[in-house]
Swiss-Prot record:
SUPFAM superfamilies for this protein: C-terminal domain of alpha and beta subunits of F1 ATP synthase (SSF47917), N-terminal domain of alpha and beta subunits of F1 ATP synthase (SSF50615), P-loop containing nucleoside triphosphate hydrolases (SSF52540)
NCBIfam families documented for this protein: atpA, PRK13343.1
Assembly and oligomerization: F-type ATPases have 2 components, CF(1) - the catalytic core - and CF(0) - the membrane proton channel. CF(1) has five subunits: alpha(3), beta(3), gamma(1), delta(1), epsilon(1). CF(0) has three main subunits: a(1), b(2) and c(9-12). The alpha and beta chains form an alternating ring which encloses part of the gamma chain. CF(1) is attached to CF(0) by a central stalk formed by the gamma and epsilon chains, while a peripheral stalk is formed by the delta and b chains.
Gene: atpA1
Record key words, sorted: ATP synthesis, ATP-binding, Cell inner membrane, Cell membrane, CF(1), Hydrogen ion transport, Ion transport, Membrane, Nucleotide-binding, Translocase, Transport
Binding site for ATP: G169, D170, R171, Q172, T173, G174, K175, T176
Keyword Translocase found: yes
Native source organism of the sequence: Syntrophotalea carbinolica (strain DSM 2380 / NBRC 103641 / GraBd1)
Family (UniProt): Belongs to the ATPase alpha/beta chains family.
Cellular component terms (Gene Ontology): plasma membrane; proton-transporting ATP synthase complex
Reactions performed catalytically: ATP + H2O + 4 H(+)(in) = ADP + phosphate + 5 H(+)(out)
Official protein name in the record: ATP synthase subunit alpha 1/3
UniProt-listed InterPro entries: ATP_synth_asu-like_sf, ATP_synth_asu_C, ATP_synth_asu_C_sf, ATP_synth_F1_a_nt-bd_dom, ATP_synth_F1_asu, ATPase_a/bsu_AS, ATPase_F1/V1/A1_a/bsu_N, ATPase_F1/V1/A1_a/bsu_N_sf
Molecular function, one GO term: ADP binding
Site, Required for activity: residue positions: S362
Length: 502
């Protein structure tokens, strides 16, 4: 076989030209201590705050402390097999989670990995978890309503798209139930819902998911769960992962609703993390930046202006109080960050007023401008009437001989309280709420005993659906009560009153 020197030269030249010397440079560090979900690593001098690190066994971590001779990192996963002396690699990426349509209907953990056995997330894109909230110029004032389907909220503490409304109360007062009802009521409202469970029992989260499935709400809901058995770093990151998923829809001109259940446990997880990282403790042993922890999370809920698509992200954070104490550290922080609060009271809950909303202490600072005009018309005097009723009821305990006007006001107030009660998982469309509140406010139920008002309400809805569907339709379309519509409402309520037997 005859090989020519020219051919050999040509082959060598070609190989030299095509030679691509790829060198993968990665910065490695060594674990000097590990425990309680925290690792201290030596040798990562160029690590960034919030950067992802790769630990042995495909576990990821997040840089939280940058110190002179080491970095403190939170391990976002199982720590049992990670030991002192192991190597850790920088990724050069800030913590990211998957976002997009692929997440709807799924249950994921605090870093967006599916935990519902439904397979991998197809077609999801990654987004950084820690990003800046929209500024003032990019926002628009809240003007569209979020209907929760609960009479007491939609009438007295209305919520608008882009608002942050705190749900606060002791344990077992119906905080989660209220948020779940709000999610169920978003069916057909073009709203994506995100439920973030922080430090909850896995059995409780499974019950919530089951309830959402029963009511067809998982078709538009994402559940992010960082359970009580998960390490503190995962509980800390979960709300940020949830809000990042919500921002994807907000930034694409859609509307999203996010529930954080609850931020008290989130603050406790962050306190644990901070103390393990040896950050100096402050009031109640919380670190100094615990206010910023929640403010930077809740400021990301916003109503964007029309140039940016007009999307919105509405937040319903939940806070658990101890014995009704609103003045402790975390409750006061979150009250000052949010645009209003719904205060649930244990005494009301146990006396049968459910949802157990204390109307006097609950307020919506920006929701009034988003409330449906018809609801504003019928519920305008409702708060005042309930306040007067409570004052008179307290006064009437001391005296038995009350004049007729006082007795009438007490009777009306008791009926208003009764009408605002509502069973769980039965949210109502706003037009039905308007009609029943109109009936109670204008004396149509004054002559009935309190015990029959629940039946009155149910039969009224049935009567309206079967005989006066056009009235409900007109109310839903017009969203305001004019003279003609009011005359029709009066006629319908009078006709129903004639056939109703207490």
């Amino acid at each position: 076989m005859d090989i020519k020197a020219e051919e050999i030269c040509a082959i060598i030249e070609q190989q030299i030209e095509n030679f691509d010397r790829e060198i993968e440079i990665s910065e490695m560090g060594t674990i000097i201590s590990v425990g309680d979900g925290i690792a201290r690593i030596h040798g990562l001098n160029r690590a960034m705050a919030g950067e992802l690190l790769e630990f042995p066994g495909d576990v990821i971590g997040m840089v939280l402390n940058l110190e002179e001779d080491n970095v403190g990192a939170a391990i976002l996963g199982d720590t049992h097999h990670i030991k002192e002396g192991d190597s850790v690699r920088r990724t050069g990426r800030i913590v990211e989670v998957p976002v997009g349509e692929a997440l709807i209907g799924r249950v994921v953990n605090g870093i967006g990995q599916p935990i519902d056995g439904g397979g991998a997330l197809e077609g999801a894109e990654a987004r950084q978890v820690e990003i800046k909230a929209p500024g003032i110029v990019t926002r628009k004032s809240v003007h569209q309503p979020v209907q929760t389907g609960l009479k007491a909220i939609d009438a007295l503490v209305p919520i608008g798209r882009g608002q942050r409304e705190l749900i606060i109360g002791d344990r077992q007062t119906g905080k989660t139930a209220l948020a779940i009802d709000a999610i169920i009521n978003q069916k057909g409202q073009d709203m994506v819902c995100i439920y973030v469970a922080i430090g909850q029992k896995q059995s409780t989260v499974a019950q919530v998911v089951d309830k959402l499935k029963q009511h067809g709400a998982m078709d538009y809901t994402i559940v992010v769960s960082a359970g009580a058995s998960e390490p503190a770093p995962l509980q800390f990151i979960a709300p940020y992962a949830g809000v990042t998923m919500g921002e994807y829809f907000r930034d694409n001109g859609r509307h999203a609703l996010i529930v954080y259940d609850d931020l008290s446990k989130h603050a406790v997880a962050y306190r644990q993390l901070s103390l393990l990282l040896r950050r100096p403790p402050g009031r109640e042993a919380f670190p100094g930046d615990v206010f910023y922890l929640h403010s930077r999370l809740l400021e990301r809920a916003a109503k964007l202006n029309d140039e940016l698509g007009g999307g919105s992200l509405t937040a319903l954070p939940i806070i658990e109080t101890q014995a009704g104490d609103l003045s402790s550290y975390i409750p006061t922080n979150v009250i000052s960050i949010t645009d209003g609060q719904i205060f649930l009271e244990a005494d009301l809950f146990y006396s049968g007023v459910r949802p157990a909303i204390n109307v006097g202490l609950s307020v919506s600072r920006v929701g009034g401008s988003a409330q449906v005009k018809a609801m504003k018309q019928v519920a305008g005097t409702l708060r005042l009437s309930l306040a007067q009723y409570r004052e008179m009821a307290a006064f009437a305990q001391f005296g038995s001989d009350l004049d007729a006007a006082t007795q009438k006001q007490l009777a009306r107030g008791a009926r208003l309280v009764e009408i605002l009660k509502q069973p769980q998982y039965q949210p109502l469309p706003v037009e039905k709420q308007i009609l029943v509140i109109y009936a109670a406010n204008n004396g149509y139920v004054d002559d009935y005993p309190l015990t029959v008002l629940r039946r009155y309400e149910e039969e009224l809805y049935s009567f309206l659906e079967h005989r006066h569907g056009d009235l409900l339709k007109d109310l839903a379309e017009k969203k305001a009560i004019d003279t003609d519509l009011e005359a029709r409402i009066k006629a319908v309520l009078a006709a129903f009153g004639e056939q109703f037997t207490p």
